[in-house]
């Protein structure tokens, strides 16, 4: 499988995953024109569109793409029916595409119906988990979002995290402010600062890396709890997550 990231809108990424037959899936097309350009550039034929949630910066290109590929199936959670999805998915479903299987994982929090697609080693997780961060909670609860991220956390270290926004540098600055003594975060902040100065992408990332530099995956650590609470032994992991997310919202 070959993975292509397409910069779109202000800071989005649209993902293409293709096989040896030059067939591909399009994940979260927030706009159509860069997708059409990439398909032409790489001589790819789309087999389906996969949607993670209903926000316009993830679905805004669907109708235009369907003008060019009118028989293209569009998969997504129930909340994307109004956005052009024709096959609605839920937890435990699998989708057969590219001579392969994509597993559907429900990850509510950012939106109430948000899903992710897993085709090892690739995870297309929309706005749930970002590099060094996580999505804002618009429709769900902090505990829901924490539990959704825990579903991702059990995947293997080599899982390729294909998230939908270039937020890595901002997330690392926040993490460094919370925990300035953490050498892994500080080193990666320096590395990503150099990458972004060259206007290069910081994505995709891997789950193994995120376990080290993403505080939202480290809510169980007592040292982090001490940073956030006067009673670190009495605070639950999801409450640590809630505190972090609240602080990030104001950062």
UniProtKB/Swiss-Prot annotation:
Keyword rRNA-binding: no
EC number: 3.1.2.6
Co-factor(s): Zn(2+)
GO annotation terms (biological process): methylglyoxal catabolic process to D-lactate via S-lactoyl-glutathione
UniProt keyword annotation of DNA repair present: no
Catalytic activity: an S-(2-hydroxyacyl)glutathione + H2O = a 2-hydroxy carboxylate + glutathione + H(+)
GO MF annotation: an example: metal ion binding
Record-linked CDD domains: hydroxyacylglutathione_hydrolase_MBL-fold (cd07723)
InterPro entries: Clx_II_MBL (IPR035680), Glyoxalase_II_hydrolase (IPR050110), HAGH_C (IPR032282), Hydroxyacylglutathione_Hdrlase (IPR017782), Metallo-B-lactamas (IPR001279), RibonucZ/Hydroxyglut_hydro (IPR036866)
Pathway recorded for this protein: Secondary metabolite metabolism; methylglyoxal degradation; (R)-lactate from methylglyoxal: step 2/2
Keyword tags: Hydrolase, Metal-binding, Zinc
Enzyme class: hydrolase
Alphabetized Gene3D superfamilies for the sequence: Ribonuclease Z/Hydroxyacylglutathione hydrolase-like (3.60.15.10)
Binding site for Zn(2+) 2: 57-58, 127, 165
SMART domains: Lactamase_B (SM00849)
Protein name (database record): Hydroxyacylglutathione hydrolase
Annotated organism of origin: Pectobacterium carotovorum subsp. carotovorum (strain PC1)
């Amino acid at each position: 499988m070959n993975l292509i990231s397409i910069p779109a809108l202000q800071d989005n990424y649209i993902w293409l995953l293709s096989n040896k037959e030059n067939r591909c899936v399009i994940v979260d097309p927030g706009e159509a024109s860069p997708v059409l350009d990439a398909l032409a550039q790489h001589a790819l034929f789309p087999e389906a569109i996969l949607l993670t949630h209903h926000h316009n910066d993830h679905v805004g290109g669907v109708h235009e793409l369907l003008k060019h590929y009118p028989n293209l199936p569009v998969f997504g959670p129930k909340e994307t029916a109004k956005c052009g999805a024709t096959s609605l998915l839920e937890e435990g479903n699998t989708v057969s595409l590219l001579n392969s299987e994509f597993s559907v994982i429900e990850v509510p929090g950012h939106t109430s119906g948000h899903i992710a697609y897993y085709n090892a080693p690739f995870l297309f997780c929309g706005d749930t988990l970002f590099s060094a961060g996580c999505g804002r909670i618009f429709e769900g609860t902090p505990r829901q979002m924490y539990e959704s991220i825990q579903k991702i956390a059990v995947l293997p270290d080599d899982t390729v995290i294909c998230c939908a926004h270039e937020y890595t540098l901002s997330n690392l600055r926040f993490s460094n402010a919370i925990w300035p003594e953490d050498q892994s975060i500080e080193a990666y902040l320096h590395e990503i600062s150099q990458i972004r100065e060259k206007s290069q992408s910081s994505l995709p990332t891997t789950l193994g890396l995120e376990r080290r530099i993403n505080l939202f995956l480290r809510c169980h650590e007592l040292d982090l709890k001490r940073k956030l609470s006067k009673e670190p032994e009495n605070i639950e992991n999801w409450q640590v997550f809630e505190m972090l997310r609240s602080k990030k919202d104001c950062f």
